[in-house]
Amino acid sequence: MKVRTRIAPSPTGFPHVGTAYIALFNMCFAKQHGGEFILRIEDTDQLRSTPESEKMILDSLRWLGLNWSEGPDVGGPHAPYRQSERMGIYKQYALELVEKGHAFYCFATAEELDQMRAEQQARGETPKYDGRGLKLSQEEVARRLEAGEPHVIRMKVPEEGVCKFNDLLRGEVEIPWAQVDMQVLLKTDGLPTYHLANVVDDHLMEITHVLRGEEWLPSAPKHQLLYQYFGWEMPTLCHMPLLRNPDKSKLSKRKNPTSINYYRDIGVLPEALLNYLGRMGWSMPDEREVFTLQDMMDNFDIQRVSLGGPIFDVEKLNWLNGQWIKGLTPGQLLDRLLTWKSDRSTLEDIAAAIQPRINLLSEAVNWAGFYFNHMPQITAEMFESKKLTQEQVRQSLQFAIWRLESQFTWNNDTVGQTLMDLANQMGIKLRDFMPTFFIAIAGSTSSTPVMQSMVTLGPDLTFARLRHALEIVGAPSKKEVKNWEKLNESLKLPKNEATSEA
């Protein structure tokens, strides 16, 4: 049996270091066993999936030095490798489960399910599908299907007993069936959920080992059932420990930048980032800290993975990157520097922004320096304003982050309109609103136009600077976040609707 592993990212945002971490361990495991590592795009979420995000994911993984033998960009014997191009496959398997008696139709509306959950919570129960679709007679199901009523297909789940499965790192794992929901397999629009598409594709693509984050442990019983229902052999499972912030919380962009592109843009070498991710819960037999991808593949053993949550510490990453930089010759370092900021389009944008402001070429350093710095040097006092309260400064930064995060098109129009709309909806004049962003992005109110600067820097560096500024002036508490989310949404409503909502 040839070992086959995969990474299956969803193209719904910026490329996450967690994706690279799981991809690295899948690739090393496959190479250790003389097997194959493939890439599949799981884009069943048609509302949030974008070609731009897919391209960023592929480019960032390639930049790191990860390679796959099959995928949407290189083809292969199991093509297509985008789930959106495989939609016709999933429905037939869902219907097969219905015919075998392992799945059923459910006609419950969203409102009915909301009421069901509310009643369960009122009784102190954990919200869970109550199996109402199982009570329908075959005649009623046939009649409602004939009438064209909206419906989903759900999988049947045992009501009693315990699901047992083996994990490469954890040994035998037990999860009571009572904790497992009757998962939707096919949605009302005919699209599959993650669980059905994942199992079908792993089987058809002959995946033998699934290395994934431990957040998928609760889903393993559903997947085991589906393999049993289809009569297929389930791949060997291995649930990797999650990357964590220094405070042991799950790695999140609120506390640490999580985009691969961010670390590339600030000057982290791909070898160093891959080296650092390789040390997340794993170590070389000789315990050395600096090693190459080839070193890791040559010495890889999955049993050396520690289940303690690995800490993603940016300071440690910076130190490791420094070791890699110090190992370069001056000529190699120059090549890396030129490659780091070699995009002519970006440099032309910077030149155009500073051109009206300089009389000597040497003055370009002062005006353009913030484009190349890791993070501007700012203090809370710099944000003090006669026009805005501290609350308005904090909210303007947080609201801008939330709104800009939803923009997949990053240009002058989208960035500019987002900020202008926010200022207008908050009732703040633009000239009073923008200094906060000049300071957050450039470290000074004397700078090139800040909206253009944000576009030139790109979303990853922009978000990092806005979040850094928010930390400086005071990030919202969990309670404030909930209240601010509601306020941010209400600001988008027409004034009469916002008033009635209040």
UniProtKB/Swiss-Prot annotation:
GO molecular function: ATP binding; glutamate-tRNA ligase activity; tRNA binding; zinc ion binding
Highest taxon listed in the record's lineage: Bacteria
UniProt keyword ATP-binding, yes or no: yes
InterPro entries attached to this UniProt entry: aa-tRNA-synth_I_cd-bd, aa-tRNA-synth_I_codon-bd_sub2, aa-tRNA-synth_I_CS, aa_tRNA-synth_I_cd-bd_sf, Glu-tRNA-ligase_bac/mito, Glu/Gln-tRNA-synth, Glu/Gln-tRNA-synth_Ib_cat-dom, GluQ/Sye
GO biological process: glutamyl-tRNA aminoacylation
Motif annotated as 'HIGH' region, chain positions: 9-19
CDD domains per record: GluRS_core
UniProt similarity note: Belongs to the class-I aminoacyl-tRNA synthetase family. Glutamate--tRNA ligase type 1 subfamily.
Name this protein carries in UniProt: Glutamate--tRNA ligase
Organism whose genome encodes this protein: Acinetobacter baumannii (strain SDF)
Taxonomic path: Bacteria, Pseudomonadati, Pseudomonadota, Gammaproteobacteria, Moraxellales
Gene name of the encoded protein: gltX
